Amino acid sequence: IPRVTPSTLTALAEEKTLQTSFIRDEDERPKVAYNQFSNEIPIISLEGIDDETGKRAEICDKIVKACEDWGVFQVVDHGVDAEVISQMTTFAKEFFALPPEEKLRFDMSGGKKGGFIVSSHLQGEVVQDWREIVTYFSYPTRARDYSRWPDKPEGWIAVTQKYSEKLMELACKLLDVLSEAMGLEKEALTKACVDMDQKVVVNFYPKCPEPDLTLGLKRHTDPGTITLLLQDQVGGLQATKDNGKTWITVQPVEGAFVVNLGDHGHFLSNGRFKNADHQAVVNSNSSRLSIATFQNPAPEAIVYPLKIREGEKSIMDEPITFAEMYRRKMSKDLELARLKKQAKEQQLQAEVAAEKAKLESKPIEEILA
């Protein structure tokens, strides 16, 4: 099948087979089902986190343990209004159900800041992810370009503003906890971001004809400081803490946020807090919606451990800007993809040569028989 980037993925969801541009190498394919849920990821109630009593200390201990263990946990009783969450998800579902031409009015290909895109993948990578997304660059607020925010369904812009504000508050609250755990002033991690940047990414994973051959979102760690993910009840978020040998599917919890740390948070803590290694799988039964809110440092923010514990060395050779850290991460990912492609081509050439040699060593009578 020729490689075709569809106008939208929703059209491909009805096909019987998957287009080759979405088929991943065997070692990258899902190993665990989208609905084979694990309870290994802790669910932490934030009720009482603002009381400067024993309750706060208890919650902080749980968060710190989760960050040291997995780099990912879920929070409930987080103070984000259920009505805002409900409106945000309802509007998002309505947007993805719009006809392709309505969604493509906000097409963000070609480097536009925000909008709609089909099957994002890194430039230079061959395999595409099975998802459609809407991206909002929401902080700093002065940099917002509302012409890139979908105006349908009506009312979504106002709800997204409110949602992004509430999630920024929650993210800062969680970073305060981690700063204290590192023995630093409360605002240390937030200050290290200089002028915190926020990106809201709404992911829509349509049902997929051959989900065992592809991923909704390839395996990765987030580059930024902290990510908050709202997911529906379908399931598909997976995490690994042994470099991909074993995977678990995170149990969806109604109204909860899945919190994970990114590379920036990992470096600031000198590796004490894990940057969660994760991916999204898809299924053939139903579509899935998730909303990821990324809090990142400003491009010029300096990345270096804020505290190095006694007897430890820095996990970084030198302080670098976040922009440079991100550039190096992208270059490394592209180089790995290139090497993998090269190895595949060499293996194919070796197999062809072996077949040819086998054929040449046979008597002509045997070949013609």
UniProtKB/Swiss-Prot annotation:
EC number: 1.14.11.9
Positions of 2-oxoglutarate binding: R288
Keywords tagged on the record: Dioxygenase, Flavonoid biosynthesis, Iron, Metal-binding, Oxidoreductase, Vitamin C
Annotated catalysed reactions: a (2S)-flavan-4-one + 2-oxoglutarate + O2 = a (2R,3R)-dihydroflavonol + succinate + CO2
Cofactor: Fe(2+); L-ascorbate
Cofactor note: Binds 1 Fe(2+) ion per subunit.
Binding site for Fe cation: H220, D222, H278
Enzyme class label: oxidoreductase
InterPro entries, per the entry: DIOX_N, IPNS-like_FE2OG_OXY, IPNS-like_sf, Oxoglu/Fe-dep_dioxygenase_dom, Plant_2OG-oxidoreductases
Entry keyword Protease: no
Biological processes per GO annotation: coumarin biosynthetic process; flavonoid biosynthetic process; response to molecule of fungal origin
Pfam family, one: DIOX_N
Highest taxon of the lineage: Eukaryota
Record pathway: Secondary metabolite biosynthesis; flavonoid biosynthesis
Primary role: Catalyzes the 3-beta-hydroxylation of 2S-flavanones to 2R,3R-dihydroflavonols which are intermediates in the biosynthesis of flavonols, anthocyanidins, catechins and proanthocyanidins in plants.
Annotated family: Belongs to the iron/ascorbate-dependent oxidoreductase family.
Protein name: Naringenin,2-oxoglutarate 3-dioxygenase
Organism from which the protein derives: Petunia hybrida
